[in-house]
Amino acid sequence: EYAETNFELTVTSFLHENLRGLRRSMGSTKFEKQLIKQMKRTGTVAMCKLDNNTVLEKGLYYYQGNDFASELVYSIARLCEPCLEHTDNNFNPLDAIQKGEFGDVAEDITYLIQQCRKKLESNDYNDFEEEVRRANDLNAQLSHLKRQELQRIQSQTGSVRVSMIY
């Protein structure tokens, strides 16, 4: 739920130049980082009290889960930080084309996150390959957008500073 909420908050706040929303997302991200760090410490202490067979059997899953959660939080922070800095410094906003392209992809990413969350919550992994395919398609779409932006930079049709954040 954290990833879905904060990804959406970061993107919509950035597209609408909402500094308060970006700060809220960054604060939430810092809180989540601390929470994961605390859970990792607590889990490590708990692992010391379990017998070796149980630790070997279940410990790996615990640490992998923490690592995956950390990656999600780190990714949201890597998205939010430059958006916050860009908006806070009153740099030029994205132009209408960039907003449209990025907004469309962001909606698709939010939908993918929602679908994955539903599958995890219901413990139903049927057709999970469909979500993996959708994620790969979104990666390709993001690469395509990056190439288009590089072409705009080359043709000097936009602001370099705005292109950097895009």
Q: Where on the chain are the PLM-derived regions?
A:
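Cytosolic, long alpha-helical scaffolding segments
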Residues: 1-166
